[in-house]
Amino acid sequence: MSAVSSQELAGLDVFADIPAQDLEALAVHLQPLRAAAGEVLMRQGEIAASFSIITSGRVEIRHVAPEGQDVVTELLPGSIVGEIALLRNQPRTATVLAKDDVCGYRGYNRAFECMLAMPVVAERMVCTARQRLAAYIAPIPVLTGHGDGLFLRPVLPGDAERFHSSGSFSRQTLYRRYQGGAPTEARLAYLFEVDYVDHFVWVVTDGGDGPAVADARFVRDEDDPTSAEVALTVADAYQGRGLGTLLLVALAIAARVDGIRRFHARVLSDNPPARALGEKVNARWGQEEYGVITTAGDIPDLDDLPLDYDTRLRIEQVARQVIHAFD
């Protein structure tokens, strides 16, 4: 009899909506895990043989980049750690340290195969792994002609809180962007916890660890994988600095990397900034319904985008790192 209960597994968020009986094969291949506060569970650079599911206690994820800077993240109970190296078949990307006394489960190859055999679980793991890898990427400094210390990077889950608490977006800006009021908590989770493949988001921050002051995204069409809807938002105090154009170009670069060839958008007809931005890229507007206009067009070749070569190349490299992290 397994020392791990499938009923206990079914209570974890990562296995939400999966019946306990469907987790019995996985439970057989898991072992109980206990670690004291301060104990190292995994080390960056080592060959990966296992993953862990944390059910109680916090763990610290510490990644040392090639340039020497540390990226530290704290994970709460319900998290999976060690899965990135197994998914990529590469050495571990970070060190995992128990911040509290930790309990959970440890699994090896057979257990990981059981995880991957459940499509919903595999999709959740890959999405979370992409988000963690995105956190290791150094933000790209951007110049807007105002001497700002602004940075461009892929969105991270914590950006939902940065967006919600920054107070940089007026009611009018939020209304124009979301065609209604401020987004709900559930809506924010959708907007900022993305998979980077079918839903990709860039954010601009004021300072390396500062608030998110602009974001831009594309969401791939279900009926046409080469087409995507785009949307962007720029905080009021940062409008008129060229951020909208920069973000649209960055989206075009990421979309090309992701196999998308055509963009379309829906905006309120009383949204002058969006219309002005569209006219810069020769958008042709059409009426869809009262108060809403649409535009669509092919994404230009990268060589035709209005951005210097070095910045364009860096944006392309970053996009490729997250979009093709598991290719």
Language-model segments: residues:
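Regulatory nucleotide-sensing modules
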Residues: 6-66, 81
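Cyclic-nucleotide recognition modules
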Residues: 72-127
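A short, internal acetyl-CoA/4′-phosphopantetheine-binding micro-motif in the GNAT/acyltransferase core
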Residues: 81, 97, 222, 231-240, ...
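Terminal substrate-recognition subdomain of acyl/acetyltransferases
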Residues: 114, 123, 128-134, 138-148, ...
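A short beta-loop-alpha structural element at the N-terminal edge
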Residues: 151-165
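Acetyl-CoA-dependent GNAT
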Residues: 180-229, 235
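Conserved acetyl-CoA-binding loop-helix of GNAT-fold acetyltransferases
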Residues: 234, 240-255, 280
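Conserved GNAT acetyl-CoA-binding A-motif
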Residues: 255-268
